[in-house]
Amino acid sequence: MQNLTVALDAMGGDFGPRVTVPAAVQALSYFPELKVILIGDRNAITSQLSSLGRMPDSRLSIQHCDRVISNSEKPSLALRNSQGSSMRAAIDLVAESQADACVSGGNTGALMALSRFRLKLLPGIDRPALVSALPTASGNRTWMLDLGANVSSDADSLFQFAVMGSALAEQHLGRVPRVAILNIGAEEIKGNDLVKRCAEMLSNTQSVNFIGYIEGNQLLQDAADVVVCDGFVGNVCLKTCEGTAQLFIDKLKTRMMASTIKGWIARMLFSELFTELKTLNPDQYNGASLLGLRGIVIKSHGSADVSAVVNAIGEAVHEVKRQVPSRISDRLEAVLLERHY
């Protein structure tokens, strides 16, 4: 069994060690091969461990850091003043091969800037991209990128996102994934020059199974395995999907928990529907990968609860086992050779 180490930014996210420490302990019970380095304020981390009846051991260690990068800190400022911060220390461990992956729920812009600075980009990649899985009506998943690492992108970057997303999805699915571009229509004539140029490039690439355009109303319909868009569009779509799913879950939960006869009827009629809707809960898909780097970095939701952070750690474990950066590099090399000839 392959042993692996995850560096967890214990101070990242809205709740810090109150969530990250219990999540680390749970993750250790799920993954026997896992070691976790908790990075942050030693006293705060130790206090949470004590409340769980757990202390540092051979699989769970603490690295003290005094500083936390705030969510309001600009990436450029965070990059200059990152020394001594929990996020920087977690990324440094990956850069120095002391950890196989990093997980953080902290400032997204700072995480991207620091990761790019310390880990560097893979050959053939101009920009990293955030990718995460979305649930679909069929029970499968669709990987979408970019989710906000870049506000705007050119056609070459979108093409690179498609290659990276395809390589990642293939490691999860065990088959060649279907890749589509998010557009305002499915017809070839629809869209701006950006998506048309990217579509032309993908159509001429045998290494990617490009199936054309899909529209926003198809995102959760299992119409594609990988959906490509720029970071502005992707982030808006992701937040809209998450908000809509949470709205339905909360509304139904409120109705079912009512102590009236209506609540009893709702529980009788909608219990199965509620179970189905819970599969749309964003927490179950927490853990966005920052693709295109020479190391594995997973971004957790800032508002993530314990189970959601466990899922983010689980994504890190999966990507380490599947050697995702190497798979992406191999795919890029094949695509570059194909385009050259």
UniProtKB/Swiss-Prot annotation:
It is an enzyme of class 2 (transferase). Pathway: Lipid metabolism; phospholipid metabolism. One of its GO terms (molecular function) is phosphate:acyl-[acyl carrier protein] acyltransferase activity. Its EC number is 2.3.1.274. Its main location: cytoplasm. Keywords: Cytoplasm, Lipid biosynthesis, Lipid metabolism, Phospholipid biosynthesis, Phospholipid metabolism, Transferase. It catalyses: a fatty acyl-[ACP] + phosphate = an acyl phosphate + holo-[ACP]. Catalyzes the reversible formation of acyl-phosphate (acyl-PO(4)) from acyl-[acyl-carrier-protein] (acyl-ACP). This enzyme utilizes acyl-ACP as fatty acyl donor, but not acyl-CoA. Homodimer. Probably interacts with PlsY. This is Phosphate acyltransferase. It comes from Vibrio atlanticus (strain LGP32).
